[in-house]
Amino acid sequence: MNDVAARYPWPATGRYVRAMMVMGLDGATVGPDGGSRSLSGPADLAALLAIRSHSDAVVIGAETLRVERYKPFRAKPELQESRAAQGLDIAPRLVIVSASLKLPWEEPVFTESALAPLVATVAGHDAARLDRAREHAEVLVAPGSRVDPAWLLDELYARRLHRIVCEGGRGLLGAFADAGVIDEWDVTVSGMAGATRFDLAESRDQDGFLFTRFTRRHDG
């Protein structure tokens, strides 16, 4: 386990749900590029990959899939010994929550991932749409008009997927929070507000609050 992964340990056994996100100083979860990449950086990406590398499943919303253009979840040779020792499959499984089932099925994330993605949707779709989805993913149909996080987690646990990372978007993270199913929040605060960069001047933890000061960067 590398130094970054050691900062984000998983319990040795049992079920555990992490919520992971990056946000700007103004509360934005998307940057000037319309996605999270312009808020992120090498250190944040290293944390994201370290958490994923020891997870069973990564849960995202359909819009996050479309905007962020997720790459295939492949089996990485350098991680196989570590994953096997922890009882994990060859790669994390991607789980997509989509009420509409209107997904980019031609994307490599569906055609080239080591394990077929799971897609959680709602009842009421016609047979043709469900059949198309099932050509590319394992489809879970929730009862009712929404995908309840507790129901989804039970479905994942039944498939022996116990280490869960929810990467958003914002609405899905909110649904998980409202359902009270999150065990840990891993939040990166970017020094961006809009297109303006700020630098951390001070931080302190007191009485359960994290107090920070960021000052505007003046280049040159």
Report each predicted region and the residues it spans.
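Enzymes that bind and transform nitrogen-containing heteroaromatic metabolites
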Residues: 1-220
